[in-house]
């Protein structure tokens, strides 16, 4: 698979990173909010709840949280083992690496900049006077939007669908994995594993390189 340029699109929460960003944010609200949001996240990622509806409910729980708290929570986000190796090795081989997330630009922008991702897309939190309103600003990045992002980026860069790779763990990654030339389930829920061409059960994101024939640097 190394002869032609590839597009590798990564989910963020629990794939590119070890954490669910919205769960980290909820801890800054209250213990009760943290438990509620974490439970909804688990059900949504297992494909047992509609993602858009579940995200709307979880974001409502963040109303009143300050943007300073968002910055503080972002500082606690942990990259997955092997994430930097995956990104840098793929780019060194001439491939593009992107991220698309049902999480938030406010948390993902610094991560994308630090890693040097070629493209990224996520939801935006609405804020007023420095406080979150509990709403999303703009369209929700759901399963359909993830699939659309993969296809749009591939078309923009003249990359054939067969040369696209999608990596994710949750139910909202299924459409993206199914649309990619190679769909990789990484430490994934059962619903995601069933849709994948490749399953990685070891917590090392650089193993994606081995599956798509890209050398490590």
Language model features with spans:
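Alpha-helical substrate-recognition element adjacent to the catalytic core
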Residues: 1-125, 203
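C-terminal cap/substrate-recognition subdomain and adjoining C-terminal extension
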Residues: 74-217
């Amino acid at each position: 698979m190394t002869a032609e340029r590839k597009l590798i699109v990564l989910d963020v929460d629990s794939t590119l990173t070890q954490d669910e960003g919205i769960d980290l944010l909820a801890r800054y609200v209250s213990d009760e909010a943290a438990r509620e949001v974490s439970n909804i996240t688990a059900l949504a990622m297992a494909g047992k709840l509609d993602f858009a509806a579940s995200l709307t409910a979880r974001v409502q729980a963040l109303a009143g949280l300050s943007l300073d708290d968002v910055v503080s929570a972002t500082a606690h986000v942990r990259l997955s083992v092997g994430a930097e190796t995956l990104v840098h090795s793929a780019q060194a081989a001439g491939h593009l690496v992107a991220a698309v997330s049902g999480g938030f630009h406010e948390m993902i922008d610094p991560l994308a900049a630090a890693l040097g991702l070629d493209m990224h897309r996520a939801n935006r939190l609405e804020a007023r006077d420095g406080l979150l309103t509990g709403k999303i600003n703009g369209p929700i990045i759901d399963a359909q939007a993830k699939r659309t992002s993969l296809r749009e980026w591939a078309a923009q860069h003249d990359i054939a669908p067969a040369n696209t790779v999608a990596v994710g763990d949750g139910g909202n990654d299924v459409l993206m994995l199914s649309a990619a030339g190679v769909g990789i389930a990484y430490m994934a829920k059962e619903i995601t594993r069933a849709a994948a061409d490749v399953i990685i059960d070891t917590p090392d994101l650089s193993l994606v390189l081995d599956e798509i024939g890209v050398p490590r640097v």
